[in-house]
Amino acid sequence: MKLTREKWENNFSEWFDWVIREAEIYDYGRYPVKGMGVWLPYGFKIRQAAVDLIRKLLDAKGHEEVLFPLLVPEDLLRREGEHIKGFESEVFWVTKGGEENLDIRLALRPTSETAITYMETYWVQSYKQLPKKYYQIVSVFRYETKATRPMIRLREVSTFKEAHTLHETYEDAERQVKEAIEIYKNFFEELGIPYIMSQRPEWDKFAGAIYTIAFDTIMPDSRVLQIGTVHHLGQHFTKAFDLKVQRKDGTLDYPHQTSYGISDRVIAVAVSINGDDHGTILSPVLAPIKAVIIPIPAKDEKETEKIIEYSEDVAKILVSNGINTVIDKDTEKTPGEKYYIWEIKGVPLRIEIGPRELSSNSVFIKRRDTLQGISVKKENLVSEVVKLLETLRKDLKERAWNFLRSKIRYTDNLEEAKKMLDSKAGIVEVPWCESNECGLKIEETTGARVLGKPYDSPRDVSKSTCVVCKKPAKTTLRLAKTY
Amino acid sequence: MKLTREKWENNFSEWFDWVIREAEIYDYGRYPVKGMGVWLPYGFKIRQAAVDLIRKLLDAKGHEEVLFPLLVPEDLLRREGEHIKGFESEVFWVTKGGEENLDIRLALRPTSETAITYMETYWVQSYKQLPKKYYQIVSVFRYETKATRPMIRLREVSTFKEAHTLHETYEDAERQVKEAIEIYKNFFEELGIPYIMSQRPEWDKFAGAIYTIAFDTIMPDSRVLQIGTVHHLGQHFTKAFDLKVQRKDGTLDYPHQTSYGISDRVIAVAVSINGDDHGTILSPVLAPIKAVIIPIPAKDEKETEKIIEYSEDVAKILVSNGINTVIDKDTEKTPGEKYYIWEIKGVPLRIEIGPRELSSNSVFIKRRDTLQGISVKKENLVSEVVKLLETLRKDLKERAWNFLRSKIRYTDNLEEAKKMLDSKAGIVEVPWCESNECGLKIEETTGARVLGKPYDSPRDVSKSTCVVCKKPAKTTLRLAKTY
């Protein structure tokens, strides 16, 4: 069977809504508050696998998990000027408790720099306690005025992993930015999510940051989605909160901070990037169910019973080897109907067991990504399944990376850049002198969003000139249609 | 050394504040919103162990984890009349997004019956889908007017495990109530938390329930703390939300529900119940660190280095056997200062390693609960540590249960009941005719809180009469000073 990616690529938005609904990942559009949805059991397990992975990676680098209150008093949130400017139009405010008006408005946390810096004034006095690396996994809230989208642009971002670190020096915070980038790279590598890293332009960095490094990916419809950010905050918040620590030389000074976050969007990408017109394809790293067994009924009822027994035996072997496997025993559905739904759900392997498999003591295994099948003897079951899962994981990852790479273009002509972007180019790079003025001009002319300059793999622009001012280019500027 | 429980028992409130602060479990009273605190890294790990355990127990019984939005629109929350009456004075309301007034007020979830029942109208159509067992672990919010207390009475309850189930019949929901009770019993048994189960009186059941079974425990100060509740909701919410399903016989009817919850209070109890004047004592089931190694410096610096090396070797052996162990290498603190802080933190075992241990290839292990020590040869290290942890776990549990049992009294004299309660009796049972009128009279006369009638171990009251009306008693009524 030919696995097409027509709907996936050309009607992605519709495809995505269909998959998260039919695969029972995330219920969106029915809960009666705009921009808020429900993680369904299957989706919750995918989410949990991602959460477990990021915890493991952060803990291994000495991060400590904490849990702060949801509510931030207005005066705290207003303490750092740039920060509140960036967020104030998007804050949900609690103003009442019962029928009493509260003395001070309480914000649903849009992010936690202010709350955490405030508490650090109690916790940290000396450089000897530094660096400190905290993180929490919580909901954050934004009163988005843009069109909301399930898992991608929400008013309640229900899986926000935010890390907040504190350092004696600017340089140590910069080292932390690099550590955070390595952690996120490992995270995305493990999940098979391709990414590109850019330093956001001055006019699009995090409100309160010195600079922001962002991870972006390209969705099936060629639009770019930001999936992770790392900020060097310098002393902006420590000064605003008058947080001073004793330095090694005995003087008191404001320590330096970083913060970095990832969200639900990681799951949205994991579900999207490996998809086709049959549904999603989950990397085995995230898949709650690694293999689904579909018993193929025989004409003879007793034989069917034996097939079920045999299927249970196969499932037991796999489960006891740590490979979560379910049998779809529904007697009201045909095997074909079962294939349909489990393909939408993206279970990596399907194991078909019918009379032929029963009599030959074998199973027939189909990979979700290719739908190619092989017959496997029962005695080789575990080793073959492990091998297939690993091959599938690698193949998915390679395909996803190839897709991303195929969507990055270069031109030194601004008109052409605009045309490329209008015809789903993905990301277009143009040579740039690095001035804000030219950057803003490029953004305006192309009607695209500026992602910033390359952080990872800069192009050689030594012979190029800025597309606007024609002065020698210092780097490239990345442009895209974004979410 | 004699381990006293003076402060623990007689100044419990102060003891508790001291422990959670000094052990770095929960930062309370400094975050600038009343009734909200911060889970610190050490406390977060204790919390996580409890969360992992309840997840394991619920999943094993077919519960599915989901995640609902925080915000509940006012009209949804008002749908079930009794429910909103019980909660409305305690709801935090979001009324603004940015500077815009919202069309409808949004409640910070006080609990999720309404949100979940609403979504179930989309999800469930047929008895074939039943029973459904959902749960989520989230923050819930109550605008408490009573005095707030860390982890015990909060405005943000940041670890609320709420389960919500749906059933074809009243009887199946009743079966679920029993299943939930078994799950909670297993949970508390495993954590070594003693409990007593009561059916709450009519006037103190959950707002919207047919009946409520509660788990209570007795704190060191003899006051009773509710630590878990299980509610039979009948058709109250399904009727309010017009949720009908097709029954086996083809008719449409409102299904029956249960809900059950536990909270942060479980951690508060785990920290409190096994304590003494040196701090908390954590059951190995919850302890993030099972053993702490304190190297005792030698006079000779080289020997001290060898002691450190030897300590690292010991730690490595334990960690590789799944026993999380840390070495306190701080050179600015004396061993005595280290004992002090690790005792507050309640690490189950302390391993002292000095010149004597180094030369004899042994370690000296002290149990936190008794501070009794034994010398153990290195070759027996793992088996001895495992044995000690298990003995300590059992001993803690037994002591805690003995404490609870010693605090349950019986009298058929109301005056005496009042006296007992005023002199820290814990729980007092009196014979009761089971009428609301007499129950309320008992509550009024004693000035105590009525916990309800025994669910677990009812007394034989066949020869007794109600303390108020003198008619034959049907059961006992439990009274207590409560949190």
From Swiss-Prot, chains A, B:
GO terms for cellular component: aminoacyl-tRNA synthetase multienzyme complex; cytoplasm. Keywords: Aminoacyl-tRNA synthetase, ATP-binding, Cytoplasm, Ligase, Nucleotide-binding, Protein biosynthesis. Its main location: cytoplasm. It is found in: Cytoplasm. Its EC number is 6.1.1.15. One of its GO terms (molecular function) is proline-tRNA ligase activity. It comes from the Archaea. Gene3D superfamilies: Anticodon-binding domain, Bira Bifunctional Protein, Domain 2, C-terminal domain of ProRS. It catalyses: tRNA(Pro) + L-proline + ATP = L-prolyl-tRNA(Pro) + AMP + diphosphate. PROSITE patterns: AA_TRNA_LIGASE_II. CDD domains: ProRS_anticodon_zinc (cd00862), ProRS_core_arch_euk (cd00778). GO terms for biological process: prolyl-tRNA aminoacylation. The keyword Nucleotide-binding applies. The keyword Secreted does not apply. Belongs to the class-II aminoacyl-tRNA synthetase family. ProS type 3 subfamily. Consists of three domains: the N-terminal catalytic domain, the anticodon-binding domain and the C-terminal extension. PANTHER family: BIFUNCTIONAL GLUTAMATE_PROLINE--TRNA LIGASE, PROLYL-TRNA SYNTHETASE. Homodimer. This is Proline--tRNA ligase. The gene is proS.
